[in-house]
Amino acid sequence: MHIPAGFYPDWLLMLGNIIAIPAVLLAIWRTETRFWSGWSEGLQVAAIFMALSALYMLQADIKPGMAVHWLGVMLTVMMVGPWTAILVLSAIHVFLLLSQGIGDVSTLGFNIATSVLLPVVIASAIHLFFYHKFPRIVPIYFAKVGFGDLMCMWAVDAVLTLCLLTWSGYPSFHIYQDFTLILALMGGMEAVISTWVVAGLVCYFPIWLVTFNDEEYINGK
């Protein structure tokens, strides 16, 4: 979601910057260098960047300067891992701000904290939970991606709704009508689409999924 300038108090936006900047720097340090040095891996990152940039521009405007968009976090984490996902998704926010004027410089850190960092943490936790607690079979892998995308979208919905209710003075009825319902519906659609995409990747490009291993999920080893 893109928050307009002046919608939240300055201290909350500053808190977003305090959280986002160290997290992005840590992601730069921890990300796997093969995603930047290898031709195939670089192509994969570029494809994710272009696809999500296009999807983010297909946003639903709620009020002037305020819009919601697809997240694609769970699928991105499954493809490149959490640290690279943070870099790619944060870069998309910066790219859209500079090239399309989507968002605002003062709210960039808050947007990254809520629309990138929080969903990536949730996606990683869901992946680890399913990996260790459920059988490692392909249908479970598909279900994990769909469930994770839905939970990521709803988590962002819950946090931003709480902030809106607490600090913005935005009427609660309009929050439900214009914001919460839209994100809930988008979460469901994103879960279905992500499940289809990951099914195609498992069948044709499993090498693009760093969290998928043929020996574990197909051969049962």
Residue ranges and their predicted role:
Residues 1-6, 63-66, 70, 100-104, ...:
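Membrane-interface helix termini and inter-helical loops of multi-pass transporters
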Residues 1-11, 16-42, 171-221:
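Alpha-helical transmembrane segments and their cytosolic interface
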Residues 18, 45, 49, 53, ...:
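Alpha-helical transmembrane spans of integral membrane proteins, capturing the lipid-embedded, hydrophobic core
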Residues 22-27, 97-98, 105, 111-157:
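Short helix-perturbing small/polar motifs within transmembrane alpha-helices
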Residues 36-53, 72-75:
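Loop-to-helix transition at the N-terminal end of transmembrane alpha-helices
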